[in-house]
Amino acid sequence: MTDQADTAMPIQFTDAAAAKVKGLLEEEQNPALKLRVYVTGGGCSGFQYGFTFDEKVNDGDFTIEKQGVLLVVDPMSLQYLVGGEVDYTSGLEGSRFFVKNPNATTTCGCGASFSV
């Protein structure tokens, strides 16, 4: 496990995203949960982002702690997310976690998939 104290932060975790995770964990009443962001093949642009709650941190995972909650990224996904930012938005189109990724050369219209 690598955390922010060991290395420069290759990905950012915004206050808005951390606050939403904190609220969701309070609703679930399970403080062991962490937000995991990952990249998989698929979507209309080749790769897509995924978000899930996970109790485990695996060897090699990168973690960021903010507001008492953890964001976890596996090493394979991290290579596609370096320089990016995990954020949260709520508006007329709904609420969601999303990734601002400077490595993406193209994205689909909804922003859920990308190519590099």
From Swiss-Prot:
InterPro entries: FeS_biogenesis (IPR000361), FeS_cluster_insertion (IPR016092), FeS_cluster_insertion_CS (IPR017870), FeS_cluster_insertion_RrpA (IPR023063), HesB-like_dom_sf (IPR035903). Keywords: Iron, Iron-sulfur, Metal-binding. The keyword Iron-sulfur applies. GO terms for biological process: iron-sulfur cluster assembly. Its cofactor is iron-sulfur cluster. GO terms for molecular function: 2 iron, 2 sulfur cluster binding; 4 iron, 4 sulfur cluster binding; iron ion binding. It comes from the Bacteria. Binds 1 iron-sulfur cluster per subunit. The keyword GTP-binding does not apply. GO terms for cellular component: cytosol. SUPFAM superfamilies: HesB-like domain (SSF89360). Iron-sulfur cluster binds at C44, C108, C110. Homodimer. Required for insertion of 4Fe-4S clusters for at least IspG. Belongs to the HesB/IscA family. This is Iron-sulfur cluster insertion protein ErpA. It comes from Shewanella baltica (strain OS155 / ATCC BAA-1091). The lineage of its organism: Bacteria, Pseudomonadati, Pseudomonadota, Gammaproteobacteria, Alteromonadales.
